[in-house]
């Protein structure tokens, strides 16, 4: 198999010149660069990208930690990241955790071992105390408001956004309002923000007002059944995604249940079924997160939400 010494011999240049060509070094004459490429083509030589990455100290790959690889919320963030990464000739590696803290730490180790150049965390399983040390090895970017914690972030003002959704339901005369979420408030910053918004707008939050474990349409149907069979049936439900809202809508239709529904995501589902939906502009959030990865100075970027009312 050909190596750079053989390429150097056949091209009548030094090994260091071949190395510079492989690493796109500017200080090589165009004549020598063309000659080296011609010999590489004749020998059908393919550079060892891993070795070159080690020499450069860069892989041009960014890791994206996300809980699930098939969830519309995270799909939008990933779409934004990959679009921005492509424009800057970076590859993205998706790192699903299913909210397993140990798996998340294994992915953080990829940064320490230089397998990736940086990490964008769309949603985390570990406390920041377990994550901060890895900033020594490369950029770590969050897709949530990190507050006083020294981690660059692209974020929504979720409390304000969620409060707007609850206020909309209150303005429509609803007093018994419930909501769904993925994880409990003590494990999820997003749910904690939603719970805080609920209390600010609706008053006391009781266990009967919320249900976790909701990810898709099937979960939405089960959530609707849960609320429908409860002692005090809610007149309005704020679902954590349009898919979950669609499941609630389906159950309500089957059971002639007059319940108002709000979704999240502003997808074609909410437009077809005709319920309001909160749009957190997650693709733009992903684009902003990647821009922070490229920056030398840490910064925070706030992404504005939109509340799409029923037409």
Swiss-Prot record:
Regions recorded as binding DNA: 4-23
Family annotation (SMART domains): HTH_LACI
UniProt superkingdom: Bacteria
A Gene Ontology molecular function term of the record: transcription cis-regulatory region binding
Keywords per UniProt: DNA-binding, Repressor, Transcription, Transcription regulation
One Pfam family cited in the UniProt record for this chain: LacI
Transcription regulation found in the keyword field: yes
Record field: transmembrane: none
HTH lacI-type domain ranges (all copies): 1-56
BP GO terms, sorted: regulation of DNA-templated transcription
Gene3D superfamilies for this protein: 3.40.50.2300, lambda repressor-like DNA-binding domains (1.10.260.40)
Subunit: Seems to be complexed to phosphorylated HPr.
Protein task: Transcriptional regulator involved in catabolite repression of several operons.
Name of the protein in question: Catabolite control protein B
Taxonomic classification: Bacteria, Bacillati, Bacillota, Bacilli, Bacillales
